[in-house]
């Protein structure tokens, strides 16, 4: 079984490879009657699109989305929505050496070990190029949850964190790092530039907050909202860790310090803290849902690395091609999309079980 789908009721399947003719997504379970056009999806793809600054890969992809099915006269029909994005700037010749040897840190060896055959061009299915399809699907998911606002940003690159005292949401769209701290963004220019010029790469942390999520979404035990979010975020290329709320910091706290006290509010409780990240017992509390996602440094670097060939012989490999010096930067729209996809699914699940 090949697991290329995600979700329960609001479900999507992605298809395509980095150097194939196109990639895309099929969204199933979307309610009928929602206004949907390609123009509504495009801004989210534009935010993720490569080649927009020297701090991302220089692969030039317009990422123009086409809706092939599931929409009639500008409204969803309730049938599968097929979305397609053409690949137009592949340079497969850059990957000739990768056909014979495994790139350290990439999925090359693991794919060969599992399937006995792999598309080595740009990583094939394991390439972060696949995330364009998720972003398109996430734009559709947002239509299902108009009451929810989702915002993500880069909070750390190469160990250099933002100062939350300088947080300005409006700043996120003003710089190429999706950074809410203009002081940090200025530092990151040199940090990422130095990595790019030396042929190295840097890791990053992306934070995401969803506000407007009502209490009651999610389920206990094996279908927890936080488990669904962790599943979604860990499925993003290059992600190596996920925290909900305070995450690992909770292990260094006390019961008193980690609790989220409440007092009476206007019809709903007023929380005095949000260490839990808006989720308790796997169910949303009505507080903002908060997630942090750790992206590893891009494995494609210009330093020759020891590896082996498909025949098991020792060799060295220098990765060619066009790559992100910090893949976490373009991870921001992807994290937002996965948050939207999970929450749209959870809303429909809750409605089906509880009628809310």
Curated annotation (Swiss-Prot):
Its EC number is 4.2.3.5. Reduced FMN (FMNH(2)). GO terms for biological process: amino acid biosynthetic process; aromatic amino acid family biosynthetic process; chorismate biosynthetic process. CDD domains: Chorismate_synthase (cd07304). It is an enzyme of class 4 (lyase). Its cofactor is FMNH2. GO terms for molecular function: chorismate synthase activity; FMN binding. Keywords: Amino-acid biosynthesis, Aromatic amino acid biosynthesis, FAD, Flavoprotein, FMN, Lyase, NADP. Homotetramer. HAMAP family: Chorismate_synth. This is Chorismate synthase. The lineage of its organism: Bacteria, Pseudomonadati, Pseudomonadota, Alphaproteobacteria, Sphingomonadales. The gene is aroC.
């Amino acid at each position: 079984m090949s697991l290329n789908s995600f979700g329960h009721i609001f479900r999507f399947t992605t298809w395509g490879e980095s150097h194939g003719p196109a990639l895309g997504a099929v969204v199933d379970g979307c309610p009928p009657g929602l206004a949907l056009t390609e123009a509504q999806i495009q801004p989210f793809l534009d935010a993720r699109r490569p080649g927009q600054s020297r701090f991302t890969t220089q692969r030039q992809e317009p990422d123009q989305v086409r809706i092939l099915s599931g929409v009639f006269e500008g409204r969803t029909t309730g049938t599968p929505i097929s979305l397609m994005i053409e690949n137009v700037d592949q340079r497969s010749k850059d990957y000739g050496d990768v056909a014979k040897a495994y790139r350290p840190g990439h999925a090359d060896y693991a794919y060969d070990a599992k399937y006995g055959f792999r598309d080595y061009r740009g990583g094939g299915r394991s390439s972060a190029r696949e995330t364009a399809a998720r972003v398109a699907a996430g734009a559709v998911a947002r239509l299902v949850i108009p009451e929810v606002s989702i915002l993500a940003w880069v909070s750390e690159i190469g160990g250099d964190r933002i100062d939350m005292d300088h947080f300005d949401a409006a700043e996120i769209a003003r710089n190429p790092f999706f950074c809410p701290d203009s002081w940090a963004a200025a530092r990151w220019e040199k940090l990422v530039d130095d990595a790019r010029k030396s042929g190295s790469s840097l890791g990053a942390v992306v934070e995401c907050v969803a506000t407007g999520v009502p209490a009651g979404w999610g389920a206990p035990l094996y279908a927890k909202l936080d488990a669904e979010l962790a599943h979604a975020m860990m499925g993003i290329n290059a992600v190596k860790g996920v925290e909900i709320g305070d995450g690992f910091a909770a292990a260094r706290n006390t019961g008193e310090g980690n609790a989220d006290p409440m007092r009476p509010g206007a019809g709903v409780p007023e929380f005095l803290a949000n260490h839990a990240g808006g989720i308790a017992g796997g169910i949303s509390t009505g507080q903002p849902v908060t997630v942090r996602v750790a992206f590893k440094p891009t494995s494609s670097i210009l330093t020759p690395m020891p590896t082996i060939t498909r025949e098991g012989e020792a060799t060295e490999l220098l990765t060619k091609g066009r790559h992100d010096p910090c893949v976490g930067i373009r991870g921001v729209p992807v994290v937002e999309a996965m948050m939207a996809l999970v929450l749209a699914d959870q809303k429909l699940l809750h409605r089906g079980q509880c009628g809310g």
